[in-house]
Amino acid sequence: KAMDVFKCKFGQGFGMTETVAVICLMTPEEHIRALNEKPELLKSCGRPALDTQVEIRDENDNPLPVGEIGQICAKGPQIMKGYWNKKEESEKALKGGWMHTGDAGRMDEEGFVFIQDRIKDMIVSGGENIYSTEVEAALFAHPDVVDAAVIGVPDEKYGEVVKACIVKKEGSNVTEDDLISFCKDRIASYKKPQSVDFIDEVPRNASGKVLKKVLREPYWKDQERQVS
């Protein structure tokens, strides 16, 4: 509809300050193909840009096969040489000559990359990886949820469990049990929130990014794990 109204074409790119330019690009032609033939591609940030290599790697820095979720890593002439006066951070980010983006994602058989979540926002509960964005998407489908952020909080049995921080619609009577049950019908049971906090506002920075560190800190301050 927007393409018809504004008489324009859409593209999609993915990059970060450390990569200077994009590392993945979905061209206008690929966008049109997605609209007409393969709508799931609209969730992709595209394929590796010109002269750029992109791989999905596991926690041991090994390349993963098609469809598996891991860290998005990139290599190319546009990648930074390092952080100014931060040797240790530079070596970690550029391990093996590949930029480790900190983003979790997967690649399909055509090379299209799909971003799943930030690695640091992934919740590991009882050995299962839970991506906060998936749980948040389920919560946002509830008509009484105005805003939502999902975090992991300490749990003696599972290491950490899912907690939802919710801003509900004014005058809503929705309860913790209502939202947990709502999620259970939409995502795997082990991914559903184990608890819900109702808050007045989800903390965000100037660019609108959710400050999950602020939400996590009260729960992790007495734990050995470092909040990042």
Residue positions per predicted region:
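AMP-binding/adenylate-forming catalytic core of the ANL superfamily
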Residues: 76, 81-82, 89-92, 104-191, ...
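Generic short beta-strand
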Residues: 39, 53-54, 104, 201
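Acidic/polar alpha-helix N-cap and adjacent early helical turns
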Residues: 217-228
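Conserved beta-loop-beta connector loops within the AMP-binding
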Residues: 51-73, 109-110, 172-176, 211
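Conserved ATP/PPi-binding loop(s) of AMP-dependent carboxylate-activating enzymes
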Residues: 24, 32, 47-51, 62-92, ...
